[in-house]
Design a protein with these regions (language model features):
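Positively charged, amphipathic and often flexible ligand-engagement surfaces
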Residues: 1-307
Length: 307
């Protein structure tokens, strides 16, 4: 019930406007968001790199309502890719299509993301653009664009997708992405979806996560296993060892500010780790979804917000 409430709040525009303007809201966000500026995000990336972990930078925002907002967001990502190369960071970027104007003009969104992929592909060394997955109304269009971009000359290995294990269609989508040689980030999913589209029971979501993890690890393609769930991590490690899959052939991924102890423990044990670092002023929907994924985070925030 609490999870459903938090997801509902993540979509509430008046609550979002109030929270993003409040000092208390901003303080709450700092646990999971690196800051509001590019420089703050890059500083966080450098700090994480020093701990032996890679980074994926996300300029927070979604469902922009005009072309100018979409172009401004793309400019931020262009700058990020430039700064990553200049500062020699172990970092890539994660992009939402609705932040690139998918709701406004699909052609524009395609053009802007294509420009980011081209920038990443021309880097020295080449970089990588992860196209984030959003709610189910966007699933097919998102995957179609990833496939389209991946097929373009020079883009192989530069653009990747995200699969959510709570989606019933997940296995079918994984099979198609693997057949095309596309890199995948596997997560559980954090949007409210109806039963005909998504598994509702945690046990079903977890079982599908393990099943899809095994498919990814056996593929020979470099993927990201994104989870903070110790049982999912243990299942991935056990399968990798059973199949003699080397640690450098995939990476675990976790969110900024969550289970830092576990992140560092896995690195010490020889596993690769990438931390997803969000930043920007539009942090409210992201924060609410993180709290919905793990309501215990809400208690943590309330205990620490006034310290």
């Amino acid at each position: 019930m609490l999870r459903a409430l938090l997801i509902h709040l993540s979509e509430n525009r008046p609550m979002r406007a109030m929270a993003e303007r409040s000092i208390v809201g901003l303080r709450m966000s700092r646990r999971f968001v690196a800051g509001t500026t590019v420089e703050e995000a890059l500083a966080a990336a450098q700090a994480v790199n020093r701990l032996g972990m890679g980074v994926s930078l996300d300029n927070l925002g979604e469902n922009v309502t005009n072309a100018e907002e979409a172009r401004q967001s793309a400019q931020v990502y262009q700058r990020l890719l430039h700064e990553i190369e200049e500062r020699k960071l172990q970092a890539n970027v994660s992009v939402k299509l609705t932040h690139m104007g998918l709701d406004v003009d699909e052609k524009l969104a395609r053009e802007l993301v294509s420009g980011l992929v081209a920038k990443a592909g021309n880097g020295h060394p080449r970089n990588f653009v992860r196209v984030d997955m959003e709610g189910s109304p966007y699933t097919q269009r998102t995957l179609d664009l990833v496939h389209e971009l991946h097929r373009q000359p020079g883009n192989a290995g530069v653009v990747g997708a995200v699969i959510q294990s709570y989606m019933r269609r997940g296995e079918q989508d994984v099979e198609k992405l693997l057949a095309a040689g596309i890199r995948i980030r596997l997560c559980k999913g954090a949007y409210k979806e109806p039963p005909e589209i998504a598994y509702q029971k945690k046990s079903e979501v977890d079982a599908n996560y393990v099943k899809l993890t095994k498919m990814l690890l056996k593929s020979g393609i470099y993927h990201g296993i994104a989870t903070h769930d110790p049982r999912m991590i243990e299942a991935a490690i056990a399968f990798a060892r059973q199949e003699r899959i080397p640690p450098q052939s995939f990476e675990f991924q976790m969110l900024y500010g969550i289970r830092r102890d576990l992140q560092q423990k896995l690195v010490r044990e020889g596993w690769r780790m990438r931390v997803y670092i969000p930043f920007g002023t539009e942090w409210y929907p992201y924060l609410m979804r993180r709290l919905a994924e793990r309501p215990a985070n809400l208690l943590f925030l309330m205990k620490n917000i006034f310290r």
